[in-house]
From Swiss-Prot:
CDD domains registered for this protein in UniProt: Adenylation_DNA_ligase_I_Euk, OBF_DNA_ligase_I
Homology family: Belongs to the ATP-dependent DNA ligase family.
Broadest EC class assigned to this enzyme: ligase
Cysteine disulfide partners in this protein: none
Entry-linked SUPFAM superfamilies: ATP-dependent DNA ligase DNA-binding domain, DNA ligase/mRNA capping enzyme, catalytic domain, Nucleic acid-binding proteins
Reaction(s) catalysed (UniProt annotation): ATP + (deoxyribonucleotide)n-3'-hydroxyl + 5'-phospho-(deoxyribonucleotide)m = (deoxyribonucleotide)n+m + AMP + diphosphate
Record-given protein name: DNA ligase 3
E.C. numbers: 6.5.1.1
GO cellular component, one term: nucleus
Annotated stretches, region: Disordered: 1-25
GO molecular function, one term: DNA binding
């Protein structure tokens, strides 16, 4: 891909007028957005309803607006030119303060109930600067970009209103086609690249139902009770009426929309911008200390008051972290790569033939994904794309201490014999697969150590003993990233303890004196060492690198037990030894070689043939799966008053959907049933009588209560079967039938995994095909 000069932010497009002709009028963003001009007729002023709070609510919103504006004027940083490269030392600083907000005066217009109830295009037409041609937005990006580059100038434009994004969300929510979702996202991102690139980062986070990477530790902390209180105060709705809305709709956005639909205010709030919504969510997350709960409540009310029509629906979902429009990680990365490739190559792109263009799109997407998996932070990704473009992305985004790497994953196999058949003619190592918590240990050049979980959350405060032992084991000062399993252990005899022992350790602010359960770090890889990435080294060289820089400390800091042989009997004995030592089985890894199907390099976020799991099976045929509870029925007889059975699902990473796979009612204790029923009671806010998520695919199975996907359970069964009732892996094996699990049994809660770390639909399909070929 030849390098292209990037268009500098703020530069206008060259005039297309010929010499001697009058310059053509440049069509501004306002002209582009005029296609769907407001069709609302003026509505006579109406009296306020008996909700007397509305006037004071608006005054309160204005007060908060003025407060935000004064804060922004005092703290807004000077904008950096695009050719400035951020020093590596500054990557760990808070990048959120780059978000700027409009200081425009609010307009004084009466909002009537008719306007509140109007369709979203009509309501959105009030904000003319952000009324996008939504018909064009749904067209092929190459068709869309022709109008974009001819009409936009990228200077002197206003920040996009949130309504433009909410309207796009509505279009995305109307389809489950990944191609159409990518098209809509690509075109909206292209619009921002031309007209408002400063809103790109905020847009990406809002689209992905997040406000920051997991390792930033930023959580909104707005629970169902606070959200309901905000709705009651903003909308003047009673608790019983609000409960009825929850029972009827189950979705926080739909509840907010219906609760606010008849609310009238004296004046129309200032239109929310994309950056304003995002920065307010950050303020909610950053509210700590005395008065934090009240501050969060006030900010939540501000967003609800300031939003109208479709805006309130999606703001409500964002506040409750329940957006679910299908813009999952892979979809967003594909959309970003396509938008930037088109923008960077806008003068040449129409010269590509179709096959060449698709190849360029695929290459660009692969570059963006590889870069993001090494540095999984949209703040850095988008900023680097804006500055460098796709062609220079890999050189400017590589693994570094302090930012966790997306972990490499192991593929599944039926048994040792099958593994040996797959790895014929390859040198490999068999390692104990310990039953602990997978973790990355990072050390920067100053000796500061951080620890991250497998789903990229920082857990440093939970393991002060690991920090201590990592410092002791290091032979000489250098920066590094190592990966291993944190395993509960009896240090007196080296005996490995059950994983449940480790889960009892406190999660925050643990001191060495507080520790009652000791851990041993069983290292199995090194990804960065002494200023250099080790990802492209074969495993055998990465091991050598580890032993050159670290000493082993018995029962505290060890390398995984491993065996290098192709002899089946020796491997079988080693497997038995692993089970005797309370391990889950073996992880078999290719040591060297350049075969792309069996890589010996470290491949972030990939489940390749270079790592193969061999686990002890429940019935010697069925490997366990990590499933997500998404619903339940009310129990009968002895289980009356509890939830039983429980509906479980696999995860589809392409759509973000949780696909129902089976009902489980075996393996639970009475105490577990009691705790589960309390956790997912209707009063908890973790469940609903209606589907909470649009992307929970239950097929022909209808539970009596729906759970918010939030935890992972390890499940074993007897067999995978084809099913017309369940949606799991639908289309991967048969177009009209999904897959289900016979005789599922609960094993344990996987507290080290989040819902998106659950077993995927493709894993289930692979297991089914292996079962058929047995």
């Amino acid at each position: 891909m030849p390098p292209k000069k990037r268009m500098k932010n703020g530069s206008s497009l060259k005039s297309t007028s010929k010499k001697g002709e009058k310059s053509r009028n440049i069509i501004t963003i306002q002209d582009l957005f005029s296609k769907r001009e407001a069709q609302l007729t003026d509505t006579p002023n109406k009296l306020l309803t008996d909700h007397d709070q509305s006037a004071s609510d608006y005054a309160y919103a204005l007060k908060l607006q003025q407060l935000f504006d004064s804060e922004n004027q005092a703290t807004a940083p000077e904008k950096l030119p695009k050719d400035v490269i951020i020093p590596e030392e500054e990557y760990h600083t808070d990048t959120f303060n780059v978000v700027k907000e409009s200081n425009d005066k609010p307009k004084e217009n009466l909002v009537t109930s008719e306007e509140c109830k109007a369709s979203f295009f009509s309501t959105d037409s009030v904000n003319k600067d952000s009324t996008i041609d939504y018909d064009a937005l749904q067209k092929d990006p190459l068709t869309y970009v022709k109008s974009c580059r001819a009409r936009f100038v990228s200077k002197d434009t206003k920040s996009f209103s949130y309504s433009s994004l909410a309207n796009t969300f509505s279009l995305i929510s109307s389809t489950k086609s990944r191609i159409r979702i990518v098209t809509l996202l690509t075109n909206f991102l292209l619009t921002l690249l031309y007209a408002d690139p400063d809103s790109l980062i905020a847009t990406v986070w809002l689209c992905t139902n997040s406000i920051a990477p997991n390792f930033y530790g930023k959580n909104l902390g707005v629970g169902p009770a606070m959200y309901s209180k905000a709705l009651k105060e903003v909308c003047g709705i009673t608790a019983s009426a609000l409960k009825n809305l929850w029972n009827k709709y189950g979705d926080p956005g739909d509840v907010a929309f219906e609760a606010k639909v008849s609310v009238r205010t004296l004046s129309r709030p200032e239109p929310l911008t994309i950056k304003k919504v995002y920065s307010t969510l950050l303020k909610i997350a950053d509210s700590n200390g005395n008065g934090a709960q009240n501050r969060k409540l006030e900010l939540t009310k501000f967003l609800l008051i300031s939003s109208n029509a479709e805006e309130v629906r999606y703001i409500g979902r964002s506040i409750m972290q329940n957006l679910r429009i299908g813009a999952v990680q892979n979809t967003m990365l594909a959309s970003l790569s396509k938008a930037f490739f088109i923008f960077d190559n806008q003068n040449e792109i129409f010269n590509f033939n179709s096959d060449s263009l698709q190849q360029q799109f695929r290459q660009g997407e692969e570059i963006v994904k590889q870069s993001f998996f090494q540095v999984p932070d949209y703040n850095i990704l988008v900023a680097t794309l804006l500055r460098e473009g796709i062609e220079n992305l890999k050189d400017n985004m590589s693994i570094r201490p302090g930012i966790p790497v997306k972990p490499m994953l192991g593929s599944i196999t039926k048994n040792l014999q099958h593994m040996l058949e797959r790895l014929t003619d390859h040198n490999f190592s068999c390692e104990f697969k310990y039953d602990g918590q997978r973790a990355q240990i990072h050390c920067d050049r100053l000796g500061n150590i951080k620890i991250f979980s497998r789903h990229l959350e920082e857990i440093t405060g939970r393991f002060p003993d690991v920090i201590e032992v990592a410092q002791l084991a290091l032979k000489h000062s250098c920066d590094f990233i190592i990966e291993g399993e944190l395993v509960a252990i009896d240090k007196s005899n080296g005996q490995i303890l059950d994983f449940q022992k480790l889960s009892t350790r406190e999660r925050k602010k643990v001191t060495v004196a507080d520790i009652t359960i000791d851990v041993c770090v069983f290292v199995f890889d090194i990804m960065f060492c002494d200023g250099k990435s080790c990802l492209q080294m074969p495993l055998i060289e990465r091991r050598r690198m580890f032993f050159e820089h670290f000493n082993l400390i018995p029962n505290r800091f060890q390398f995984v037990s491993s065996l290098e042989t192709n002899e089946e009997q020796s491997i079988q004995e080693f497997f038995s030894l692993a089970i005797t030592n309370k391990c889950e089985g073996l992880m078999v890894k290719v040591l060297n070689g350049t075969n792309s199907k069996f890589p010996s390099t470290y491949e972030p976020d990939k489940r390749g043939e270079g790592w193969i799991k061999v686990k002890q099976d429940y019935d010697d045929e069925f490997e366990s799966l990590d499933l997500v509870p998404i619903g339940a029925w009310y129990g009968n007889g002895r289980k009356a008053g509890w939830f039983s059975p429980i509906l479980l699902a696999v995860y589809n990473p392409d759509t973000g959907a949780y696909e129902a796979v089976c009902k489980c009612m075996s393996g639970f204790s009475d105490q577990f049933y009691k705790e589960l029923t309390q956790k997912y009671s209707l009063e908890s806010g973790n469940s609903s009588l209606k589907p909470i998520y649009n992307f929970c695919e239950t097929g022909k199975v209808t539970p009596q209560i729906y759970f918010a996907p939030q935890e992972v359970w390890e499940i074993k069964g007897a067999q995978i079967t084809s099913s017309p009732a369940y949606k799991a892996a639908l289309g991967l094996i048969q177009d009209d039938r999904g897959l289900s699990i016979r005789f599922p049994r609960f094993i344990r809660v996987r507290s080290d995994k989040g819902p998106e770390d659950a077993s995927t639909n493709s894993i289930l399909a692979d297991m089914y095909m292996k079962q058929l070929n047995t």
